[in-house]
């Protein structure tokens, strides 16, 4: 039979007590007493888990090397993260425009719907790039999103002109990303940009350019009636089709 001391927990000790017996007199029996040793209590479980995890984590905190990464240059990975930030910034600007035009003292609700649609499209563009980053084995590094340059968009014409400039900036960034991908010999990234972004950007620039031109012809921004009619008929029809 194994001695009971083998089954004692590390931090529990025993003491002896006297038990009086009518037949046998006094006897020594072990009594279980939770008398704790000097190294009790042990480290908290959460701290132990964190220490174990940190011992396995690389120094840069980036996680284990990707098993799916192939022909994906670090410069392309960084440029995609910058493009994600730009797409989110564009979405932020269009969201500001949308809720400016839905104010009670502006009340151009088709302008509001138009820019809200653009905001959602830009957010989808950012998410699509995030999915690409994961598919290629890159690391998504989100950055601070810059606030819009203005909160008062003044007129429909001013907002359309700002949107046109913004779309050109986004397009230029995409073109530079495409050039980088080509220089690094990454046909998949080139095809991805051509399929999902470049053609759509050209269409958006043309659409916004047409809107600016038509508003100017109608007498905006001096004529408030021009923006009202443009909101009601031109953008109203577009929103119905979309």
UniProtKB/Swiss-Prot annotation:
Catalytic activity annotation: 4 Fe(2+) + O2 + 4 H(+) = 4 Fe(3+) + 2 H2O
Single GO MF descriptor: ferrous iron binding
GO cellular component, one term: mitochondrion
CDD domains to which the protein is assigned, alphabetical: Euk_Ferritin
Localization in the cell: Mitochondrion
Transit peptide location: 1-49
Binding residue positions for Fe cation 1: 87, 122, 125
PANTHER family: FERRITIN, FERRITIN, MITOCHONDRIAL
Family that this chain belongs to: Belongs to the ferritin family.
Name used for this protein in its record: Ferritin, mitochondrial
